Amino acid sequence: MKLIAELCQNHNGDINTLKDMVVKSAESGADIVKIQSIKANSLTKREEYESFRKYSDEYERLSSLELSMDDELEFIHTAKANNVTPMTTIFSPNHYDYYNSLGYDYLKLSGYSMRAFDYGLKLDKFNFKHLVFSTSSLHLHDIKKCIDNLQGVDFTILHCVCLYPTPFEKLNLASIEHLKTLHDKIGFSDHSDNLLSSKQAIFQGIDMLERHFTILDEEETRDGKVSVTPKELQELKTFSNYTKEGQYLTLNGFDEQQRFNHEYYQGRFKW
């Protein structure tokens, strides 16, 4: 299983913080490190969402997080120097010349970006080896349509819920089992605020796990609440390396109260 450290916006636009994140995630067991290639000038203004998130405020925020081409090249170099695969999420699918010039082997499209197929997205214009797309905001018929559009492409589907953090009752990890019937490479982009859901998905046999990653305090970044620390990322990597039986025993281990109850009920009646 490949473990993605999603660095997202947790670098706060600082290249040195970003490079430190790459090193720390590599040391913690990440196979892939991912950023988000956000360009503020591609942001659209929609009046119906101004009360939810004002355009001017969002533009200013994204501008402060934007990475230059030189920053992205340095990110790629740092990743490769630390033996992890660099990856990015693209938000402007028509800017293929930009991404091709950077040389990413792994690209990601979010669920809502996959609808770009309806507007003429041509993946054959991109130079990449593997594509990842998440199911956030996609209905089942949309997912099937994406699979049809990706014939001949090496890709992984990530089960994903577009809630930050995702409450337990909304995780719907059973979806992973159904996605396995549609495609052979299935993963999970986990936006929960714990490790249990990730471990459960690993036990279910996913091929790829994505977790937001931070080296800063939770309150210092926008995605802090759904981000794992280096220690937590290492815990997930260690769990993924267990045998299936080892994973089962870890997930189903008895705590002190369970052991007490077991011993109590075991001797409760005479045989």
Set out the residue ranges of the language-model regions.
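Catalytic cores and adjacent flexible loops of soluble metabolic enzymes
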Residues: 1-271
